[in-house]
Amino acid sequence: MKPLRGWQLPFLQDPCFTDLLPLLQRSLLLQGPEKLLQRLAPRPSLASETFVAFRDPQAPLGLVVSQRLNRSGSCWQIQHLRSGEASLEAGEAGRMAIEAALVRAAIQGSPNAASWIATSPGTDSTRLGLLRQQGFQQLRHETLWRWEPPQQPLDLALPADLELLPLNRRTALAMWQLEQAALPAQLRQLLDRRVDDLLDQSEQPSLMLLDTNRQQAVAGVRRLRPGHREIPELELSLHPGWQHLLGQPLQLLLEQCASGLGEVLIRSDVLQHEHNQWLQSLGMAPEGEEVVMARSVWRRHAPQTSQVVSRKLEAVLGQLQPGQKPIPTPLGR
């Protein structure tokens, strides 16, 4: 179980891996600059981390690709977990053992990560079971909706107390506060997403509806940066206290954000029945379901060595030696 090296790329010709080759090549090229720039200042992730499992260097058994989800590096995501044809000889139990070892290698290979996110199709009970064995818990069950937005966005006058604003550095704090209110508490804590992370992960146009009376974002749609899906993805956030916006105001927001796109994917929680019915009324078709899994990573801090403790003790006792500046004595009142 080793990090991917450039000389291994020619051996990743298994059909299970070939679609990942452009991503792996890019990651290898950018790993050096990524580490250097991250030491200078927190920055968005440039490159993924890849671990490869192999018995024979020319026949990889599987690989795992992971990436930072925020600038601080506190949250990481497992992007891809694949087994090759060579792992089939080990049987189903052997293949699962290989994938479990890959997940552990990814987690151990990112010592600064405090939390991990992974997703799995809702119908893949094997993958879900594997993630649970590695300490992941289900935080959200989502429906993926495929939508063909209209060529002409809805022409609608918003209520007087709502203003349509683009996401930019000036308005990002309002969008971040909206997402904090809309996300489940545990997922919000594990993602550890800051304002800069929100901007890093968004493309234009990303829009929000601002309540002008409270100066508070109450609904927003972000166009996400391209990931492993070929179809662009939109993220819809609605403040829990503003569910009445389900209708034309939110439809306007979606259509404006999806302007110029042929097809898009939109996620929603399967438990939000009213929300899902409204999405379906817009002509969206369910593409499938996905489970968001997460886990925390607790690392035991190494005890201080006796040498370090001795130096600290000497520094304290040194103040009591003759010729040293006297320690002030507090005066009683």
Can you annotate each of these PLM segments?
Residues M1-V65, Q133-E230:
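Amide-forming acyltransferase catalytic core, primarily the GNAT-like/NAT-type
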Residues G62, A90, D161-N168, W176, ...:
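Catalytic cores of nucleotide-enabled group-transfer and carboxylate-activating enzymes in metabolic
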Residues G73-G94, H228-Q243, G247:
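Conserved acetyl-CoA binding element of GNAT-fold acetyltransferases
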Residues Q134-D155, L261-R333:
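Active-site/acyl-donor-binding loops of N-acyltransferases
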Residues N213-L265:
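Intrinsically disordered, low-complexity segments enriched in Gly and acidic/Ser/Thr residues
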